[in-house]
């Protein structure tokens, strides 16, 4: 089988590529260049997609004895990931750029180029499993990345492989060390790769500018002014620019954001509880949409809690009623549906959250 191994320069994608070589496949390594501006991406051992990472990936490819290339996806990355991230925050949403990168770069732009060049599959170092075409959680629950892959279609999954999903991370590092890969002890990256400073608010402010608005309480009384809704997210408690806690002495949290009026509302923690979600552009990873109400589990953050729910396709939107509430859910987040399974929860689909509601939970 002709395999294109996406090599980030980290230990996970390196071992994934090595396993495909061991399996006897015709493997070619590729690293994605995502920025043309030096210093625009995070650099160093904790980086992602930096020049250092490209060099690390090339050295691993040399050890494995496979061809290696660097493909320039900088413009596509800027348009489909960075610009999308900025515009989402400007709309008062809270997006996940890693999900957009998987959806629009790794398994869209890269995927299309790979198939056009005659490759059978794209291999990555994601912690997830594929079983008979079904996407499942990884064995290592702490590293599971099925959430950020839940935007992939059945067709994309047919041409994808995740070779390390059945192995805990410590064993991956041990394997890399045994193979003599210099990245065996390379730290994981945790931050957004295109924000070198790690300061998301400053990054957004430089691109969106000042769009003044007000911070109000539940009754509509103005508590403070602000320079833009991009500086806030649902559930935020610190950095609100307000004098202190509410009249009852309890902390106040961001409970609603209206980008059109520039209004940020704050309230009690109880106001963050939601029992219903609405999502747009649903994707069902098995390829078929449910024909009626679907009992499932829902997750709204990459490593967040799950709660049981009933999901149903209503027109072109996904309607989800939760059995127990989730706290601090924002528009722009991705909701992912799972089917609980002792052998590894199966991903059923996903959608981008457009609305939340505090209506009564499903009984």
Curated annotation (Swiss-Prot):
It catalyses: S-sulfanyl-L-cysteinyl-[protein] + uridine(34) in tRNA + AH2 + ATP = 2-thiouridine(34) in tRNA + L-cysteinyl-[protein] + A + AMP + diphosphate + H(+). HAMAP family: tRNA_thiouridyl_MnmA (MF_00144). ATP binds at residues 6-13, 32, 125. Residues 143-145 are annotated as: Interaction with tRNA. One of its GO terms (biological process) is tRNA wobble position uridine thiolation. Disulfide bonds join 101-193. Keywords: ATP-binding, Cytoplasm, Disulfide bond, Nucleotide-binding, RNA-binding, Transferase, tRNA processing, tRNA-binding. Belongs to the MnmA/TRMU family. This is tRNA-specific 2-thiouridylase MnmA. It comes from the Bacteria. One of its GO terms (molecular function) is tRNA binding. The keyword Transit peptide does not apply. It comes from Mycobacterium marinum (strain ATCC BAA-535 / M). The lineage of its organism: Bacteria, Bacillati, Actinomycetota, Actinomycetes, Mycobacteriales. InterPro entries: MnmA-like, MnmA-like_C, MnmA-like_central, MnmA-like_central_sf, Rossmann-like_a/b/a_fold. It is found in: Cytoplasm. GO terms for cellular component: cytoplasm. Its EC number is 2.8.1.13. The active site is at residues 101, 193. The keyword Nucleotide-binding applies. Catalyzes the 2-thiolation of uridine at the wobble position (U34) of tRNA, leading to the formation of s(2)U34. The record marks 126, 333 as: Interaction with tRNA.
């Amino acid at each position: 089988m002709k395999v294109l191994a996406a090599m980030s320069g980290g230990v996970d994608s390196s071992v994934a590529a090595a396993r495909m070589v061991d399996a006897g496949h015709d493997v070619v390594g590729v690293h994605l260049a995502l920025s043309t501006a030096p210093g625009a991406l995070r650099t160093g051992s904790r980086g992602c997609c930096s020049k250092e990472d490209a060099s690390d990936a090339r050295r691993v490819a040399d050890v494995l004895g496979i061809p290696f290339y660097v493909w320039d996806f900088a413009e596509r990355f800027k348009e489909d990931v960075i610009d999308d991230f900025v515009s989402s925050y400007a709309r008062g949403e809270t997006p996940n750029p890693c999900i957009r990168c998987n959806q629009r770069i790794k398994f869209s732009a890269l995927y299309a180029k790979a198939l056009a060049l005659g490759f059978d599959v794209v291999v990555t170092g994601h912690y997830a499993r594929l079983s008979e075409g079904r996407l499942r959680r990884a064995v290592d629950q702490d590293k599971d990345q099925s959430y950020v892959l839940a935007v992939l279609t059945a067709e994309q999954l047919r041409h994808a492989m995740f070779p390390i999903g059945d192995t805990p991370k410590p064993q991956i590092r041990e394997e890399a060390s045994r193979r003599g890969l210099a990245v065996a002890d390379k730290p994981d990256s945790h931050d957004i790769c295109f924000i070198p400073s790690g300061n998301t608010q400053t990054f957004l402010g430089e691109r969106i500018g000042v769009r003044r608005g007000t911070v109000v309480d539940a009754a509509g009384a103005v508590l403070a002014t602000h320079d833009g809704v991009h500086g806030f997210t649902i559930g935020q408690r610190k950095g609100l620019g307000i004098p202190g806690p509410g009249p009852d002495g309890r902390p106040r949290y961001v409970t609603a954001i209206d980008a059109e009026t520039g209004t940020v509302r704050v309230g009690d923690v109880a106001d963050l509880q939601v029992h219903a979600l609405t999502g747009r552009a649903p994707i069902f990873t098995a390829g078929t949409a449910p024909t009626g109400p679907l009992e499932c589990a829902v997750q709204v953050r990459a490593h967040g809690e799950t709660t049981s729910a009933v999901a149903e396709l209503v027109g072109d939107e996904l309607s989800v009623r939760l059995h127990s509430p989730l706290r601090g859910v924002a528009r722009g987040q991705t909701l992912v549906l799972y089917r609980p399974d002792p052998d590894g929860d199966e991903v059923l689909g996903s959608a981008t959250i457009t609305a939340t509601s505090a209506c009564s939970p499903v009984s």
